[in-house]
Swiss-Prot record:
An MF annotation (GO) of this entry: structural constituent of ribosome
Gene behind the chain: rpmF
NCBIfam families (alphabetical): rpmF_bact
Keyword Ribosomal protein applies: yes
Protein name (record): Large ribosomal subunit protein bL32
Organism, as annotated: Opitutus terrae (strain DSM 11246 / JCM 15787 / PB90-1)
């Protein structure tokens, strides 16, 4: 089994762990009803995308 030739520095270890940080998802606000939804996606509450009705959502 391979073994490390040199000790890994604290900076290199921290940089590797930084990729595992949790990033909270951002939300956009719908101008018609004020509901929050993920940007660049269809609003699941009313089926609107960029001002157009693309899904028929039954209320």
């Amino acid at each position: 089994m391979a073994n490390p030739k040199r000790k890994q520095s604290k900076r290199r270890s921290a940089n590797r762990r930084a990729a595992n940080a949790f990033i909270a998802p951002e939300f956009a606000k719908d101008p018609t009803d004020g509901s929050a939804f993920r940007p660049h996606r269809v609003n699941p509450k009313n089926g609107m995308y960029r001002g157009r009705q693309v899904l028929n959502v039954e209320v």
